[in-house]
Amino acid sequence: ESIVRFRNRINTETGYFRGSYSPCIASNGKSGRPISVHFHGSASLAPYDGWAEDVTCFGEIKDYVYPNFRSGTGWYHDHALHITAHNAYYGLAGMYFITAKKSIGGCGEPWNLDDIEEKHFILNDKVLNSKCQLYIDPFDKHKDNLYGDINFVSGIPFPNMKLEPKLYRFRL
């Protein structure tokens, strides 16, 4: 079992709002962009499933409990009502790995992957404005989709990596 803490630090000055979506007001009286974290890859209990209206406002903290009952690659992303895509685009998305001591295949036989070095990558496309800041055109006819012109790997545009001549396990 893991407890993962999310602290919302997206205020109205740093958070981008499109259309008529309004900021949420936290119990501390501060306003900001709401977040709700949803995790794919685990049978989470309802309070930790990140449903769209269970939001954390600016300055607030929420602890999520995940059972980690099996090995695998999971991922999390924002799930706040009407702004999921924007929050994920600006960074509230990532990978979550659960590893066992031995990687066992479907028939109970070892996969023999335990000594292979792993590399983890998140792939996405983004658009940058003239100041090299992430950008979404709120008036674009594809406002609910994004067709980025720059490929990012784990947050880095067009990266490169030096590798040794050996086996690697890539998790994407």
Where do the language-model regions lie?
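Histidine-centered copper-binding motifs that mark active-site loops
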Residues: 1-171
